[in-house]
Design a protein with these regions (language model features):
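Extracellular/periplasmic catalytic domains that process cell-envelope and extracellular macromolecules
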Residues: 14-15, 136-138, 213-217
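Catalytic core and acceptor-binding pocket of nucleotide-sugar-dependent glycosyltransferases
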Residues: 152-256
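Conserved catalytic core of nucleotide-sugar-dependent glycosyltransferases
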Residues: 115-179
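Short, charged, surface-exposed secondary-structure boundary motifs
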Residues: 31-34, 77-83, 134-143
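N-terminal anchoring/stem segment of glycosyltransferases
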Residues: 2-78, 95-98, 148
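Short, polar loop motifs at secondary-structure junctions
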Residues: 53-61, 111-116, 192, 227-228
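Structural motif
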Residues: 18-20, 101-103, 220
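GT-A fold catalytic core of metal-dependent nucleotide-sugar glycosyltransferases
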Residues: 60-63, 67-74, 86-138, 145-146
Length: 256
């Protein structure tokens, strides 16, 4: 092997082993501050070398350290709804030439402890096991990890069978979990690592009126879904009448 060939092998190996934190921002629901907060939280809570990549339709205000690319088009039939399926574009066989391990994080997660293990935990594909219906295989795609380009058939199958898929699966995470399970590569994060703010942190009424939300033991990432977002957790409020929310100091300390 020549010196140049050896350099090429080393370059390829390095890129195949690099860690990429992926996020996605479209529309106006979440501003650039969510991307920047997420980047800062990852920096504070990992010792692993990583590159942050945001797939977005708006780059204004995003930290220059975050590499931005357009959200790959789903290329669905004209008139088909795309918004609910956008995350699947992270599985394009060639995502802007990116290589390595990809850890996808929703913009509204809050990191509360070291996440090195999310890069090193064994498994070809890891996702949160749905908390509400654990008897199903469906994962929650707020946090998932995979090798970029490792599922080259996922998007072609999605496009070819879209009408059938939209009837069978409620959302992208249901299709994603099913497809990876068909490949015999579906696995889940340890249960304590990713917790729901709604299900695992909020107090039940009447305790919610005088006891603040709790941080679950062993939790590394707190996932927000439903009507409550991180600003609601920091300031209090945001819940429905039957879900009273006091301010959470530990979320305030983490979300910046």
């Amino acid at each position: 092997m020549s010196v140049h060939e050896n350099d090429d092998v080393l370059y390829t190996t390095e890129h195949q082993n690099q860690n990429i934190v992926l996020c996605m921002k479209w529309g106006t629901k979440y501003g650039s501050d969510y991307v920047n907060r997420l980047y800062n939280m990852v920096k504070r809570h990992t010792t692993v070398d990583f590159k942050m990549v945001c797939l977005t339709d708006r780059t204004d205000g995003i930290d220059p350290a975050v590499q931005c690319f357009p959200i790959p088009p789903l290329a669905l039939p004209e008139g088909s709804p795309e918004r609910g399926w956008n995350k699947l574009s992270t599985f394009e066989p060639d995502l802007y030439g990116l290589k390595g391990n990809a850890l996808f994080l929703d913009l509204d997660v809050v990191i509360v402890d070291n996440i090195d293990s999310f890069f090193t935990h064994s498994g070809d594909f890891l996702i949160i096991h749905d908390w509400k219906r654990p008897w199903r295989i469906t994962g929650n795609s707020s946090v998932y990890r995979f090798k970029l380009g490792a599922f080259p058939g996922l998007m072609p199958y999605f496009r070819e069978h879209f009408d059938e898929i939209r009837q069978k699966f409620r959302n992208e995470q249901a299709y994603l979990s099913w497809y990876v399970d068909q490949e015999k590569k579906l696995s889940y994060w340890p249960d304590s690592w990713c917790k729901s703010y709604k299900y695992h942190c909020l107090q039940k009424i009447p305790l919610a009126y005088f006891k603040p939300p709790v941080k679950p033991e062993g939790a590394k990432i707190i996932v927000f879904h439903g009507e409550i977002n991180p600003p609601d957790a920091v300031n209090g409020g945001g819940g429905k009448w039957y879900r009273y929310v006091l301010p959470s100091d530990w979320i305030k300390e983490a979300w910046h």
